[in-house]
């Protein structure tokens, strides 16, 4: 499971010099991620807040999670400060989303170089990825965690990784994972019933963050952004027409992105903008809220 898959190492000069200093310091100090914390906890690096919840629910008191992309930041563009990178040198495991999220394409190999002994877990291993294409390049939708069915796969991968780095506590990790998986099963069933009975078939969103959730529960997602960019005037007109034809009354936007186009469309259709984030740490509560918002989006 020790992953050495290479990503897109495009240079990010703002922190490049600091990264080199940290890399040299880690090598000099012999940091390999194998030293346990003084309190006995296993240090686990994670990319996004939902993964932090997964790790903490499975790991319990045995782990300390280091969050690389903080709440409110955009993992497509975020650059970690040197202090966070220094913390990674203490980690025994990195729970990477593993789905092509831009932060990891830019930083995963650099993070692994800081800590060669660290186990890198692809949390999306086993997920049926959604293919995308930008500027003629094939890719995958990175937002795997937004569907509870995928979250269950990610929790299993995290559990396996924790057992590998800390076999002494394997029983606790398995029990914790099973308990959390039961909660995810309940969430999955509740969302399925909620959306099936809502009459909603299509949602419009500012950024294509919810394709896995909409796929799993029989909805269609229309994204306002065009290949990650604000829509052209022509596309905006098309989206307004489409929203009217689909009788869409709510445009969903995320706090990590601009709401300008969502507000324009909402004004034109006499609707409203509702904020939903795919990056809240409280995964169960947030996903339940998002599904409820989707289910009520066609009401006057």
Describe the function of each predicted region:
Residues 1-35:
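Secretory targeting signatures
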Residues 2, 30-300:
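Extracytoplasmic metal-acquisition and chelation regions
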């Amino acid at each position: 499971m020790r992953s050495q898959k290479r990503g897109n190492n495009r240079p990010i000069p703002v922190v490049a010099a600091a990264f080199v200093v940290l890399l040299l310091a880690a090598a000099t100090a012999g940091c390999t991620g194998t030293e346990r914390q003084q309190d006995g906890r296993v240090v686990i690096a994670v990319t996004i807040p939902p993964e932090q919840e997964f790790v903490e629910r499975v790991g319990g008191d045995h782990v300390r999670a280091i969050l690389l992309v903080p709440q409110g930041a955009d993992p497509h563009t975020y650059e970690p400060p040197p202090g966070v990178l220094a913390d990674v040198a203490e980690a025994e495991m990195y729970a990477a989303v593993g789905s092509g999220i831009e932060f990891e394409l830019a930083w995963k190999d650099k993070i692994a170089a800081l800590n060669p002994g660290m186990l890198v877990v692809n949390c999306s291993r086993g997920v049926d990825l959604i293919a995308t294409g930008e500027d003629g390049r094939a890719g995958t939708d990175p937002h795997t965690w937004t569907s509870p069915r995928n979250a269950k796969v990610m929790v299993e991968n995290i559990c396996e990784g924790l057992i590998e780095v800390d076999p002494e506590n394997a029983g606790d990790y398995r029990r914790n994972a099973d308990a959390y998986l039961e909660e995810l099963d309940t969430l999955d069933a509740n969302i399925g019933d909620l959306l099936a009975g809502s009459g909603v078939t299509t949602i419009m969103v500012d950024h294509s963050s919810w394709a896995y959730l909409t796929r799993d529960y029989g909805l269609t997602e229309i994204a306002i952004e065009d290949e990650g960019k604000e829509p052209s005037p022509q596309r905006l007109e098309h989206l307004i027409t489409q929203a009217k034809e689909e009788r869409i009354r709510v445009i969903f936007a995320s706090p990590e992105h601009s709401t300008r186009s969502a507000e324009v469309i909402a004004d034109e259709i006499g609707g409203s903008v509702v904020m939903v984030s795919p990056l809240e740490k409280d995964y169960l509560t947030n996903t339940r809220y998002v599904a409820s918002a989707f289910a009520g989006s066609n009401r006057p």
